[in-house]
Design a protein with these regions (language model features):
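Exposed alpha-helical structural elements
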Residues: 44, 59, 122-125, 154
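A generic structural signal for well-ordered alpha-helical segments enriched in polar/charged residues
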Residues: 62, 66, 161-164
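Short, conserved beta-strand/beta-arch hydrophobic-aromatic motifs that form part
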Residues: 75-140
């Protein structure tokens, strides 16, 4: 019977506290713009993405800028999130567009009235997954909607409902 050298046998057995699989050693996504003293331009967000994702990001951005009384600014959310494009309607925050790793994400907070007014069943599976993974409280629900694939259309639908409820108040 042949056995492997002792060095190889020891390498196959993990030590206490050592991670055993590549998925267990997965690193968190890289922050696109982490430094507070280096604010990016609005165009540099889409420039960091592959062409197809950059177009979706720009489409969401242009949709938001076409809405009446909506303004865009670049806002620093902290070292874990970095810089993002923040959109405000009048004085109230509307949403934010940011890069999470190498993916564009739209973040929207919905009040209870906006969440009740939204037709959740009309959203794609990406929008429904965003609802399933939403965080916050029933009075203020936070949705992280990936802008890849059909998520961009879901993001626009959610923002339209939020704008409609903001206009009523």
């Amino acid at each position: 019977m042949r056995s492997s050298p002792p060095e190889k046998r020891r390498a196959a057995v993990p030590k206490a506290g050592e991670r055993t699989s590549p998925s267990a050693a997965a690193k968190p996504p890289r922050v696109a713009f982490p430094k507070k003293n280096q604010p990016p331009s609005a165009a540099s967000f889409a420039a960091r993405l592959p062409l197809a994702l950059g177009k979706r990001f720009e489409m969401a951005r242009s949709f938001l800028l076409r809405q009446p009384d909506v303004k865009e600014d670049v806002y620093y959310y902290g070292p874990k999130t970095g810089w993002a494009l923040r959109y405000v309607h009048g004085e109230q925050p509307l949403c934010a567009l940011l890069l999470h790793g190498d993916l564009p994400v739209g973040i929207v907070s919905l009040s209870a009235s906006a969440a009740a007014a939204l037709d959740w069943k009309a959203l794609s599976p990406i929008g429904q997954a965003a609802r399933k993974h939403a965080h916050g409280s029933p009075s203020l629900l936070w949705l992280d909607v990936p802008l890849a694939s059909t998520g961009a259309a879901d993001f626009k639908a959610i923002v339209r409902v939020k704008l409609a409820t903001l206009d009523r108040t």
